[in-house]
Amino acid sequence: MSTQVQEQVVIINAEGQILGRMASNVVRLLKEGKKVIIVNGEKAVISGEKNRVIESYKLLLTVKTLFNPYRNGIRRPRSPINIVKRTIRGMLPKSSKGRRMLKNVKIYVGVPKEFEGRQFIKFPDSDVSRLKGKYVTVEVVSKELGWSG
């Protein structure tokens, strides 16, 4: 029984992976019913010039609401874990099935001790070597947004 459960867990190394392409591959695995663990989530990259990428993320922080922002403001992701998870969430179905699939995703900053020495997967179609232009890591974006990690 435990060997069958172990086969359903996929561990992905996000270091040097393009965030959007990696997220679409993760969604494909989730639709197959697998549990996905992502390590080095802060080392995933977002394509584009650094200033443009950061400004586009900061633009989301300036959105105002007519409601009391202290009671129910618009929550925006700032930590690398939440940025990656939000990207994956945007690609999942907007239904109860999508919410169940999102619970099968775990994202870690760095590599936890329990996963050291394990085999990681990297998607060849989402490797950073595909990019000809500039890119920025998720860690840099989240530190610019105010993440204190």
Curated annotation (Swiss-Prot):
Q: Report the superkingdom from the record.
A: Archaea
Gene Ontology cellular-component annotations: cytosolic large ribosomal subunit; ribosome
A GO MF annotation of the entry reads:
structural constituent of ribosome
Q: Mind telling me which InterPro entries this protein's record contains? A: Ribosomal_uL13, Ribosomal_uL13_bac-type, Ribosomal_uL13_CS, Ribosomal_uL13_euk/arc, Ribosomal_uL13_sf
Q: Which GO terms describe its biological process?
A: negative regulation of translation; translation
Family indicated by similarity: Belongs to the universal ribosomal protein uL13 family.
Q: What name appears for this protein in its UniProt entry? A: Large ribosomal subunit protein uL13
- Its encoding gene is what? rpl13
